[in-house]
Amino acid sequence: MGKVIGIDLGTTNSCVAVMEGGQPKVIENAEGARTTPSIVAFTKDSERLIGQPAKRQAVTNSENTIFAVKRLIGRRFDDPVTKRDTELVPYHIVRGSNGDAWVKAGGQDYSPSQISAFILQKMKETAESYLGETVDQAVITVPAYFNDAQRQATKDAGKIAGLEVLRIINEPTAAALAYGLDKNDGKTIAVYDLGGGTFDISILEIGDGVFEVKATNGDTFLGGEDFDTKIVSYLAEEFKKAEGIDLTKDRLALQRLKEAAEKAKIELSSAQTTEVNLPFITADATGPKHLVKTISRAELERLVADLIDRTLEPVKKALADAGVKASDIDDVVMVGGMTRMPKVRQVVKEFFGKEPHTGVNPDEVVAMGAAIQAGVLQGDVKDVLLLDVTPLSLGIETLGGVFTRMIDRNTTIPTKKSQVYSTAEDNQNAVTIRVFQGEREMAADNKLLGQFDLVGIPPAPRGVPQIEVTFDIDANGIVNVSAKDKGTGKEQQIRIQASGGLSEGDIDKMVKDAEKFAADDKHRRELAEAKNNGDSLVHTTERQLTELGDKVDAALKTEVEAAVAAVKTALEGEDVAQINEKTQALGQVAMKLGQALYEQDQANNERHDTPETEKAEGDNVVDAEFQEIDDQDKK
């Protein structure tokens, strides 16, 4: 069995780790960084860029550069939060064929699972490059408050990327694993996870290798992206007041504002003030306009105060569900890049009445925890038991549109529960089972996960047929539902696929597309390497010919020039094999050139060596005689 890797698929950055010598190790990517921007771009040449290369060209290619796609995964296009995001990003969010929110880039529509799969492929390649072997199994993290549709979409992304996802693990739980792996004493901890796009809070009890989640809560649309948006809105408003121009209508300006906002936010974690300086941000009839604005830490804290306060409501709910008070928490573990912000730490400290634990790297700890879980599944990590929970209540719609809970939130998973229901009308021969997830009392106010029909019920008065509905939640938090007519034994079962979601056919097509992209990427890389090698050899050989001039035999010179011309012709095309073949042929001829040069030098040395030796010997004799005469004279 090959290595199982742990991947933190983040909104802003992603990270991959693996177990080595009993400890999780974060793997550096090709650019030498330990985290990779979760950004995918498509150039006008249809080239796909992932990570730092994609981020570098975002300003000049904003419409085709996709970031923060995790906020769209498993979401419907008509979802109010999707609508809000549509106005804030420079790329296009469109309605997928299944009604989900998709993105448009490079003239093509992509599902969020596909874009996430491209990022996962990059993580997979990073691990394979380090390990020197193929990797096809992974543990992937998701926000604890992700619903079933979002978890399933993340699992689909893994499949599209060519990975078997052994486990979907909650991010705060993964962080707790990394934090508590070497701690055996019993502790109650809170994991406060404020990342790039989501917020989670989990309360856990840790002791003797058992990690038991007591409660979890969160907000899947609250994170660093929202902090950036506040700064962008502030800068745009200030500029509009001064110049009368609305920068939010200009996609290029919006992307520049976003990058400046993120930079300012990071700088204000260590500095009291920072200057945003964006020359030539736009222009009007009077000429070019520049944006120059100084932002203080106090100003930033004022802008985002409501966002930080929003994190406290889920914290209070999680504590109440766990049956503990803030004072009962032994350690508060801070996770996610946004927890570096001094104001966030201050608010958490005031709420819990203790200094938060900052001994873990907030950007890497989740991937490390995923690697530990991978080690547990592989059998490399012993005596660790992870007991996670389902974040939201699950149930079905019953008479009057009421949401009837079958499994309450914060139930330890995996779990299974059955309940018997009946028909609402006389002689009803079919029932529709509509499955919902959420905490509201009416079904319509919760998230519809899916529905299916149980048909062939024998005619009977209402209330007589006995229909047993069974909910089964696996360790990934993914739901299976079945309905069985106890009278006839007829059964209908579904693995919940969101009312949108990707079908098996969609996934298979996307797997093939991803493989094609991988093949295209490989071809581009091989072509670039071949052209570099060919170009370099042509340059070296031509320089040698120039330096040697008439010293080269005419026949050899003609042969070398012909080989150089053949490589130059091949370099104009895209055929890797042809370029390599002609480069190799030039290499053989260039060796003859080097050999001829060496033989020529050797011949020249032999021709000049003899007279010099004789002259040197003669000089010695004269010196000796001269010395002797001198001595005699002195006598």
From Swiss-Prot:
What Pfam families does the database record attribute to this sequence? HSP70
Q: Which PANTHER family match?
A: HEAT SHOCK PROTEIN 70KDA
Gene name in the database record: dnaK
Bias regions of kind Basic and acidic residues — which residues? 604-618
Give the induction text. Answer: By stress conditions e.g. heat shock.
Q: Which GO terms describe its molecular function?
A: ATP binding; ATP-dependent protein folding chaperone; unfolded protein binding
User: Which organism does this sequence originate in?
Assistant: Zymomonas mobilis subsp. mobilis (strain ATCC 31821 / ZM4 / CP4)
Mark out the compositionally biased spans (Acidic residues): 620-635
Q: Does the keyword Cell inner membrane apply?
A: no
Phosphothreonine: residues bearing it:
198
- Protein name, please? Chaperone protein DnaK
Q: What does this protein do?
A: Acts as a chaperone.
Q: Which InterPro entries match?
A: ATPase_NBD, Chaperone_DnaK, Heat_shock_70_CS, HSP70_C_sf, HSP70_peptide-bd_sf, Hsp_70_fam
The protein's matches in NCBIfam families, at most eight in alphabetical order, are given as: PRK00290.1, PRK05183.1, prok_dnaK
Q: Which UniProt keywords apply?
A: ATP-binding, Chaperone, Nucleotide-binding, Phosphoprotein, Stress response
Organism classification, top ranks? Bacteria, Pseudomonadati, Pseudomonadota, Alphaproteobacteria, Sphingomonadales
